[in-house]
């Protein structure tokens, strides 16, 4: 694996010179191998090690290099044709392969090669980009987008129209992460490497980036780039120091544990916020 990483790191340093026409065989094979390992879930761009999320930057670099070494090609779809550098994940799947993998894909859901989809996942008409990791039991609802290299945990619900930001465009240092057992409400956006920690509930229409203030109304504390575990979050505003205007923020209205979440439905958690 170290040899593979060294090839990727070296090639990335001269990425501006690389084109589909001049990419050498060693680099091409290394990049293709990494994409295949990401596709199978054997490797992932970010993983939790000793309680901390660690981003493997060299894997992200391999994803970026794949756009340098591959030319656009015609890609067949069920109702249409496409012209892109990245093949579709399910292009060669037959019924036996789908049965073996154990997830559902509802047309016209689109998943790029290099994204991993775990068992018991349901993909409604949605989009999952290259390098993403979607873990077991997760629902990616209609028109939701899982951005490049984003990490989605187990038993997560991404509601209709949710956007989970990627790392490729614009280029971000770390992927956006949604940990296990989270609920992200319809049309919400979580981007720029924000981490939503385990068991959190994000209401409909909440937008969180690295500069978004995440205000805990019980403690008065303000977080940036991280939603603490078990938070129930709604959109809100905080007043300016001079009181003349207010600016958007996300508000943590309560904290819940797994026991409470097991007894109370998501809608009930969001209704009782007073």
From Swiss-Prot:
Output the GO biological process annotations, alphabetical, semicolon-separated.
diaminopimelate biosynthetic process; lysine biosynthetic process; lysine biosynthetic process via diaminopimelate
Give the catalysed reaction(s), semicolon-separated.
(S)-2,3,4,5-tetrahydrodipicolinate + succinyl-CoA + H2O = (S)-2-succinylamino-6-oxoheptanedioate + CoA
Keyword Metal-binding in annotation: no
Q: Which SUPFAM superfamilies match?
A: Trimeric LpxA-like enzymes
Regulation affecting activity: Inhibited by N-ethylmaleimide, p-chloromercuriphenyl sulfonate, cobalt and copper ions.
**What is known about what this protein does?**
Catalyzes the formation of N-succinyl-2-amino-6-oxo-L-pimelate from succinyl-CoA and tetrahydrodipicolinate, a key step in lysine biosynthesis via diaminopimelate pathway.
Q: List the protein's name.
A: 2,3,4,5-tetrahydropyridine-2,6-dicarboxylate N-succinyltransferase
Q: What gene does this protein come from?
A: dapD
